[in-house]
Amino acid sequence: MSLVYGVHSEVGKLRRVMVHRPGTALARLTPSNCHELLFDDVIWVKQARVEHMTFVDAMRYRGVEVVFLREMLTETMRIQEARRWLLDRRVNDNTVGVGLADDLHAHLMEIDADALSSILVGGLSKAELPVKTNSVVASVLTPEDFILPPLPNHIFTRDTTCWIYEGVTLNPMRWNARQLETVNIAAIYRFHPDFRDAGFPVWFGDPERSFGAATAEGGDVMPIGNRAVLIGMGERTTAHAVGQIARSLFAHGTAERVIACKLPKERASMHLDTVFTFCDRDLVTIFADVVNAIDAYSLRPGEKPGTVDVRAEEQPLTEVVAGALGLPKLRVVETGGDAYVQEREQWDDGNNVVALEPGVVVGYDRNVYTNTLLRKAGVEVITVPGAELGRGRGGGHCMTCPLIRDAL
């Protein structure tokens, strides 16, 4: 029997979630390539794996079913149709070059599924090529250059796709370093036995198409309940994508209101969830310096089919969100400490917590001031180590792709 997928709130009971263990892709990071791969620093992978397993154990202890991206990709690659579909899109003349594509594709069609999934996530350097070639592309590369790039940002499973109520988006991502992640996940959703017969709609996105300026990432998207969706517009998610997502949700009757939040285009606030996350039905934690400066816009179905009505909001974001949820106001816990500590704890994902159920969140132990304020507000904060994981600029919210979450 197929599972019924859907994420119907930000804090309802979390039932099933997808994560990705730190592995080969993160071990490919170097001081010379980490910025190109969207990391600020290299990571001690062994320690990051320990921290990540502690994070997974914390969720499992509270009854969450945790599935792993790499394992699901391996299981998907055991299906020949799925393997061919994905390799046709990952290994071709445009991606690896004339003279290499056919031979490499043929080789990868035959290898063990686990080895293949390792390559699809961890990359393949010229030195690791399993076939001989005199192709133009391979000829000009050094042994350390990548034929297939590593995808270290797969650890942030939140971004690649996002479940909005009973459907999902397959996100066209902002930077080249992340765009292939969506192709991998699309293969899982299309062919894996857990998903292929589940019958869920795709609201937006298609790895077969270019979406131009319409880019989106899941860290900006929050189905908050009451048929409302919160979407950040900043460094990664554009107004072009927000309009298309809203139009699709309205056309299907899934949402009645999308609140678009204009963010500064800065690294520290690359996604909405780096400065704003829910901890309880009526409680959010925010980095006030950014959130109080957000311009909010309410999108609703237009008078004519297929149109969207857009209106600027004059109230602060927290009041707009409270109104959308039918609440008199939200309780707000700001990043803790003085100005120096607040900036540090926001940078270290103090406001990027993931709720396991109403009033219970997981966050990094290093954010002592913010965690203390949350506890004083009645939130149970389960802390996990993040000395290495935090170097990637993502906390519990970023590292989880909720697949099944209850409504409130």
Swiss-Prot record:
Enzyme class, UniProt record, top EC level: hydrolase
A single GO BP: arginine deiminase pathway
EC number per UniProt: 3.5.3.6
One term under GO cellular component: cytoplasm
Pathway: Amino-acid degradation; L-arginine degradation via ADI pathway; carbamoyl phosphate from L-arginine: step 1/2
Catalytic activity: L-arginine + H2O = L-citrulline + NH4(+)
Pfam families: ADI
UniProt-listed InterPro entries: Arg_deiminase
Active-site residues, Swiss-Prot/TrEMBL: C398
Record key words, sorted: Arginine metabolism, Cytoplasm, Hydrolase
Subcellular location(s) per record: Cytoplasm
GO MF term list: arginine deiminase activity
UniProt xrefs under HAMAP family: Arg_deiminase (MF_00242)
Family: Belongs to the arginine deiminase family.
Protein's name in the database: Arginine deiminase
